[in-house]
Amino acid sequence: NPTGATATREFYEELVAWAKKYEVGIISDFAYGAIGFDGEQPLSFMELPGAKDVGIEFYTFSKTFNMAGWRVAFAVGNADIIDALNLIQDHLFVSIFPALQYTGIDALKAPERDAEINKIVDRYETRRNAFIQAAEKIGWKAFVPKGTFYAWMEVPKGYSSEEFADLLLNEAGVAVAPGNGFGEYGEGYVRIGLLIELERLEEAVDRIAKLNLFK
């Protein structure tokens, strides 16, 4: 998030070596770990040799199990970092309602878990493919995501990310997230959510096409 890019094994190997060299703890956010396209599964930082020596990984139920708003997650990895995290948790927050935690456990242990997750991933991949194809037909360049449920799209020349987002909202009735909200390197892009039905995504592209912004 927001680009849909996935980390390679080589990247993580360099990261582990860097963390060991400079004695820096690594925190990996694996929220979209189950959502990979084109037959590829995103690589967990914890799969790398030495990763548990230098870092931890967060996993949330919000994306994979559509439990956004329940605020249920867990962390695994380096014991010392986990202990420090628990200390912070104890002082800053109260525990999550136990019923929600047990629901998360049931979701992880459910026999049909993998089959249901695959259905969700297939749905996102179908939307991704249809949206990217429709966007390319009108000349809108995209970074094709390898995971997540977002598309990372270039802003046409002459507009900032915010200006383009405002234009789409006001003139086409299409809401996107301006890229500069994700940091300075996001300027020049917008993020599109692929969380609505296929027909509505195609309708959004049709509305944008009528603005004649792409050559």
Which stretches of residues belong to each language-model region?
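PLP-dependent class I/II
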Residues: 1-215
